[in-house]
Amino acid sequence: PLCVCLQLTDRRMNFLARANVFKNPVFNKMLRAMGLLPAYRMGHEGLSAVNKNFETFEDAGNSLRDGETVMLYQEAGHQDKRWLGTFKLGYLRIAFAAAEKMNFEQDIMILPSCNHYSNYFHARTDMVIKFGKPISLKPYYEKYQASQRETMMEINKVVREEIKDMMLHIEDI
């Protein structure tokens, strides 16, 4: 994420990070000041903690509304393979919540990106960052208001295909 952040320097960057690093009140304050927001995961923090994501989504939506960037990876994890994992819908929930707060008057853009590492396990190896074409959510606003989940699933497919086209994707490994 830091390498991508360094490529996008024209605005404040916000990131979602594992919630467990926010447990210490001092670290919590420091991380939030740096633009990190806690992401609660079912497999790690449990169902009751996952509901705290609504506050994170609210904070991320406020950042988007204020013209900042929220960066997250839809796969919500790391892997050392050459294939694209399953995407979660949280990034679209954040984006549409921000659009809703702005009465669907401002456009929210999704910028697909992918990272290629020459050696996933070793730092200081070659890395390539690719950015795709920004995807505007504005054409989907009306459809979203009528059918939220179906619209998010449709956009998720578009974003996933855009990222898949930018990377080395080998499904049968």
Range-by-range predicted roles:
Residues 149-153, 157-173:
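Long, charge-rich alpha-helical interaction segments
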Residues 1-150:
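Soluble catalytic domains of membrane acyltransferases
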